[in-house]
């Protein structure tokens, strides 16, 4: 996927990426994005994948979507190692702000678990909805400036409607913060604050909805 973006957006469309080579720019956006999307996808399907266990054994059901984050974190660790190798190949050293990158990672997991938990409960009641989830995640990717800057090619601001969508999207601030922390760029603290607020709300809503319908899982499954 990164090769496709690099070829068409980096070489053909020549999407501006600021001071970073496009390959590094897009990879530092896709690494945290795949952490998010993999966690959401796994959590969303976790209850249906564990239906036999849920119907026979009682345990806190919320543990099921939360446990789905484990493999995603392993993949993230491997991808981060590849990212470090790519930075070394480009002669780019991480900034001192690298130590702040885990803050963005933690908030990404907060958002992902909130969304994934909500979708997991929804999938139990509406099983066909699981086939819609990948398309929603794909649409969310293109609403997030992970593979492009949040400006047009001329540097002018994007239309107001687009900017509002990006501002309300918690992944916008989190990916921007992750990238800035990695390369020692100016840290977008305001965007991080908005992302933390929206992410915390999504996590709360996801858990509340899950707990409200949790008692019906064994009957439905």
Q: What annotation goes with each model-predicted range?
A:
Residues 25-38:
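Long, hydrophobic alpha-helical segments
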Residues 142-193:
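Short hydrophobic, aromatic-rich alpha-helical segments embedded in or entering the lipid bilayer
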Residues 36-62, 66-73:
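Transmembrane helix boundary and interhelical loop/hinge segments in multi-pass membrane proteins
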Residues 128, 211-221:
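Short cytosolic juxtamembrane segments of multi-pass membrane proteins
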Residues 75, 138-145:
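Faces of alpha-helical transmembrane segments in polytopic inner-membrane proteins
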Residues 1-22, 163, 176, 180-183:
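Transmembrane helix-loop-helix hairpins at lipid-water interfaces of multipass membrane proteins
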Residues 42-48, 118-125, 151-155:
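A cytosolic-side transmembrane-helix exit/cap motif
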Residues 3-16, 61, 66-136, 185-210:
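Alpha-helical transmembrane segments and their short interhelical loops
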């Amino acid at each position: 996927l990164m090769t496709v973006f690099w070829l068409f957006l980096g070489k053909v469309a020549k999407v501006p990426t600021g001071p970073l080579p496009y390959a590094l720019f897009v990879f530092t956006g896709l690494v945290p994005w795949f952490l998010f999307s993999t966690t959401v996808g796994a959590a969303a399907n976790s209850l249906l994948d564990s239906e036999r266990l849920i119907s026979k054994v009682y345990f806190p059901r919320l543990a099921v979507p939360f446990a789905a984050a484990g493999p995603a974190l392993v993949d993230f660790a491997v991808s981060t190692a590849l990212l470090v190798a790519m930075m070394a190949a480009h002669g780019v050293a991480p900034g001192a702000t690298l130590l702040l990158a885990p803050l963005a990672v933690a908030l990404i997991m907060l958002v992902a678990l909130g969304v994934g938990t909500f979708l997991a409960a929804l999938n139990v009641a509406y099983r066909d909805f699981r086939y819609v989830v990948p398309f929603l995640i794909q649409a969310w990717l293109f609403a997030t400036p992970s593979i492009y800057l949040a400006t047009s090619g001329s540097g002018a601001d994007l239309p107001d409607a687009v900017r509002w969508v990006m501002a309300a999207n918690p992944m916008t601030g989190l990916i921007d913060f992750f990238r800035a922390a990695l390369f020692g760029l100016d840290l977008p603290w305001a965007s991080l604050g908005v992302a933390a607020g929206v992410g915390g709300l999504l996590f709360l809503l996801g858990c509340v909805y899950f707990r409200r319908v949790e008692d019906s899982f064994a009957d439905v499954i």
